[in-house]
Design a protein with these regions (language model features):
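N-terminal regions of ATP-driven nucleic-acid and macromolecular assemblies
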Residues: 1-236
């Protein structure tokens, strides 16, 4: 099984869209490093952003084509695919199972006992081919804490890899941006895939954390280099 760092996704909507249209023979356990409420709030915020951008685009085009009809126009076409109550979407949702781990301790505990009892099916007991684990925003959860170090990240990475190996599943780590207002998805080093380039100290003990999540006066190493012991960067 493969352990990959996936950098192709920029937002939670981008990720969910891809999972919906994924191969129907695969099942994904999506481990979200936040509370359920925070996750839903982020999804709703991004849907609103998508709707606003789509409505603005449609409105401008309609105004150019038929300015007298603009007040009477509605914008059903701006609705996102994830909001469409189709049988295809319902079927796709059965292939994706969500788990929420709002703290580092919760995440490590969940991974140490993975898979939970209600995830175990007769099919899983026979084989685990076509099953994936995807952990979303692991780095964001660690960033700004005393666990954002080689020692702390190695502990969590090892727990994730152990869970995947134990269940013979492929593993992907995904970092998404929370703020999608900017078109430049790589402009903020403290969000999304930029966190893989962050420098972290070696040990979790006796470090001082600034407001921006950085530390003072310690030997450092890049997060990507720490992860390279277990993971490789997904191509494409």
């Amino acid at each position: 099984m493969t352990n990959l760092i996936c950098t192709k996704y920029t937002s939670i909507l981008h990720l969910l869209e891809d999972l919906v249209h994924h191969d129907t023979s695969t099942t994904t356990d999506l481990i979200i490093c936040s509370t359920r409420e925070e996750f839903l709030d982020e999804v709703v915020t991004q849907l609103d952003h998508h709707h606003h951008n789509s409505s603005t685009s449609v409105g401008r085009q309609d105004e150019e084509d038929a300015p007298d009809l603009v007040p009477a126009m509605t914008t059903p076409s701006s609705s996102h695919a994830l909001l469409s109550p189709t049988l295809f979407l319902l079927s796709a949702s059965q292939r994706c199972r969500l788990a929420f781990c709002p703290s580092i301790t919760t995440l490590r505990g969940y991974l140490s006992s993975y898979p939970p009892g209600h995830f175990i099916t007769p099919e899983l007991k026979v084989h685990c081919n076509g099953h994936h684990i995807m952990i979303v925003n692991l780095l964001r959860q660690h960033h700004g804490t005393t666990e954002f170090t080689l020692q702390g990240l190695s502990h969590t990475f090892a727990s994730a890899v152990s869970a995947a190996h134990r269940t013979r599943r492929s593993l992907r780590l995904v970092e998404l941006r929370g703020d999608i207002a900017s078109d430049n998805h790589h402009s903020d080093p403290d969000q999304g895939s930029g966190l893989w380039q962050a420098q972290v100290p070696l040990l979790s003990t006796s470090i001082k954390i600034r407001d921006d999540g950085a530390s003072w006066g310690r030997r450092t190493v890049s997060v990507e280099k720490v992860a390279s012991r277990w993971f490789r960067l997904e191509s494409g």
